[in-house]
UniProtKB/Swiss-Prot annotation:
One of its GO terms (biological process) is extracellular matrix organization. It is found in: Secreted, Extracellular space, Extracellular matrix. It comes from Chlorocebus aethiops. Homomultimerizes and interacts with various extracellular matrix components. Interacts with FBLN7. Interacts with the mature/soluble form of DTR. Interacts with CCN3. One of its GO terms (molecular function) is peptidase activator activity. The keyword Repeat applies. This is Fibulin-1. Residues 1-27, 28-60 form the Anaphylatoxin-like domain. InterPro entries: Anaphylatoxin/fibulin (IPR000020), cEGF (IPR026823), ECM_structural_protein (IPR050751), EGF-like_Ca-bd_dom (IPR001881), EGF-like_dom (IPR000742), EGF-type_Asp/Asn_hydroxyl_site (IPR000152), EGF_Ca-bd_CS (IPR018097), Fibulin-1 (IPR017048). Belongs to the fibulin family. The keyword Cytoplasm does not apply. Residues 92-131, 132-177, 178-223, 224-270, 271-313, 314-355, 356-395, 396-439, 440-484 form the EGF-like domain. Disulfide bonds join 1-25, 7-26, 28-52, 29-59, 42-60, 96-106, 102-115, 117-130, 136-149, 143-158, 164-176, 182-195, 189-204, 210-222, 228-242, 257-270, 275-288, 282-297, 299-312, 318-330, 326-339, 341-354, 360-369, 365-378, 380-394, 400-413, 409-422, 424-438, 444-457, 451-466, 471-483.
Length: 598
């Protein structure tokens, strides 16, 4: 599809499923190229299935890079036959269909769905979502020295810190490329000149070359060279005077100066050079200039002549030209000045400008460093904090010692470098999926208890109990936890026994709020005129519990004070029910298991 802009139909009447799949993949590719050609986003969701969506995006992105698709060729995508539309989607049961649970990329391995992210993103801890990778902080960018890294969503870009300067242009790869003014026609050479490109500039070379003894000026005119003014190579020998002519020069003998005189530079007359060493007629700060028959004193560069004191005084360039000589700081010196920079900057090669120092290149921070203009900033990873002492060292945060540390873990918090861990008691509990709470292990459900076949397993917080009971004499078992009294047959002692004994199991932690109702007792069906009395007849030696009536025919057992430590209690509660002039007794055996609080 990328090369031919159309899809070939499967050949033969018995075209294989593979050929049919290839053609369907081809149509998905053409849809991606069509989206790019029509200016649509390559991330557009067509609800065509995960595999087709991946091919759609890949061909759309590639078409953006090549830009060679003719929209008219996309008409072929409309020619999918009804037979193809009726074929069963081979990826109907694909859990990645439509993207599945993943935010970006999804792959169904058969055993599980694996999510992944596009380049420039990283998978979050939920295993589904993706977040942008900050390549500028992680150091995974490719920016060169002199370039700043700027993070973008899914990628980054490099930006040159300084401009290229006159005569250069910035390329797409942040390089400085010389501008050929001659080729681009932006030079200012006159018609009599030929433009010749140089690095960062150009020069105009005259088309007409001058003869020996002449030099061309800026307008390509030939100007006579005064050979006699050459200081490097004097054309005439000592004792002769040089006389310039058009295109050349001549020489003649010089006069013979008397004692105490010297021939001047022109060789025309004799003069005394009062400025010649070791004589210093002008004094400190002056420059002596010889003249015919005399001399004059001038101030050196960096000094000016004070008409009042008649002396050369130092020029304070920093005050005379404020902010124009130096980029940061200007310090005056005798006859000159010196530029310096603020902290975090260094002096450029021109001796005047200041450029930022990248302090991060020397790794001053213990973890992360970010260079800023004129300084730098240290950062710490999650679980660490910057030291208040030096501002560069990252110290571990003891999450367990924070004011909220007691609420981080339900049982015990253990600090580790950069994070913390929660733990549970050695037995009876396991750590919840959130990594903070402790969940009770129901040994009775999981089958890890050691109760015998004649015992009943009862789960409590952090453990379990094996319970078994037998009905006392003159009673028979009527339910799993209930005993009924046998007929008494005129036996008075027997008639005083409770009609029913029922066993109950209760469990609560030591930190339960008191007072608290833990058990309610009354007849299963009340009759008008019923009344009752409730009393604890055993197991309350320490006075943790009490009874009270809440209605004429029902009462409750309440906890009056917290049980200070884990323990097992057996409480016997007796209810006397008065009905139609007779009294019937009922007993409740309460197995109470007090567990430790987390």
């Amino acid at each position: 599809a990328n090369e031919q802009d159309h899809c070939a139909a499967p050949r033969g009447d018995n075209a294989s499923l593979e050929a049919t799949f290839v053609k369907r993949c081809c149509h998905c590719c053409l849809l991606g190229r069509a989206a790019q050609a029509q200016g649509q986003s390559c991330e557009y969701n067509l609800m065509v299935g995960y595999q087709c969506g991946q091919v759609f995006r890949a061909c759309c992105v590639k078409s953006q890079e090549t830009g060679d698709l003719d929209v008219r060729s996309l008409q072929e995508t409309d020619k999918i036959t009804e037979v193809e539309e009726e074929q069963e989607d081979p990826y109907l049961n694909d859990r990645c269909r439509g993207g599945g649970p993943c935010k970006q990329q999804c792959r169904d391995t058969g055993d599980e769905v694996v999510c992944s992210c596009f380049v420039g993103y990283q998978l979050l801890s939920d295993g589904v979502s993706c977040e942008d990778v900050n390549e500028c902080i992680t150091g995974s960018h490719s920016c060169r020295l002199g370039e700043s890294c700027i993070n973008t969503v899914g990628s980054f870009r490099c930006q040159r810190d300084s401009s290229c300067g006159t005569g250069y242009e910035l390329t797409e790869d942040n390089s400085c490329k010389d501008i050929d003014q001659c080729e681009s026609g932006i030079h200012n050479c006159l018609p009599d000149f030929i433009c010749q490109n140089t690095l960062g500039s150009f020069r105009c070379r005259p088309k007409l070359q001058c003869k020996n003894g002449f030099i061309q000026d800026a307008l390509a005119n030939c100007i006579d060279i005064n050979e006699c003014l050459s200081i490097v190579s004097a054309p005439c020998p000592t004792g002769h005077t040089c006389i310039n002519t058009e295109g050349s020069y001549t020489q003649k003998n010089v006069p013979n100066c008397g004692r105490g005189y010297h021939l001047n530079e022109e060789g025309t007359r004799c003069d005394v050079n009062e400025c010649a060493p070791p004589a210093e007629p002008c004094g400190k700060g002056h420059r002596c200039v010889n003249s015919p028959g005399s001399f004059r004193c001038e101030c050196k560069t960096g000094y000016y002549f004070d008409g009042i004191s008649r002396m050369c005084v130092d020029v304070n360039e920093c005050q005379r030209y404020p902010g124009r000589l130096c980029g940061h700081k200007c310090e005056n010196t005798l006859g000159s000045y010196v530029c310096s920079c603020s902290v975090g900057f260094r002096l450029s090669v021109d001796g005047r400008s200041c450029e930022d120092i990248n302090e991060c290149s020397s790794s001053p921070c213990s973890q992360e460093c970010a260079n800023v203009y004129g300084s730098y900033q240290c950062y710490c990873r999650r679980g660490y904090q910057l030291s208040d002492v030096d501002g560069v060292t990252c110290e571990d945060i003891d999450e367990c010692a924070l004011p909220t540390g007691g609420h981080i873990c339900s049982y015990r918090c253990i600090n580790i470098p950069g994070s913390f861990q929660c733990s549970c008691p050695a037995s009876g509990y396991r750590l919840a999926p959130n990594g903070r709470n402790c969940q009770d292990i129901d040994e009775c459900v999981t089958g890890i208890h050691n109760c015998s076949i004649n015992e009943t397993c009862f789960n409590i917080q952090g453990g379990f109990r094996c319970l078994a009971f037998e009905c006392p004499e003159n009673y028979r078992r009527s339910a799993a936890t209930r005993c009924e009294r046998l007929p008494c047959h005129e036996n008075r002692e027997c008639s005083k026994l409770p009609l029913r004994i029922t066993y109950y199991h209760l469990s609560f932690p030591t930190n339960i709020q008191a007072p608290a109702v833990v058990f309610r007792m009354g007849p299963s069906s009340a009759v008008p005129g019923d009344s009752m009395q409730l009393a604890i007849t055993g197991g309350n030696e320490e006075g943790f519990f009490t009874t009270r009536k809440v209605s004429p025919h029902s009462g409750v057992v309440a906890l009056t004070k917290p049980v200070p430590e884990p323990r097992d209690l057996l409480l016997t509660v007796k209810m006397d029910l008065y009905r139609h002039g007779t009294v019937s007794s009922f007993v409740a055996k309460l197995f109470i298991f007090v567990s430790a609080e987390l």
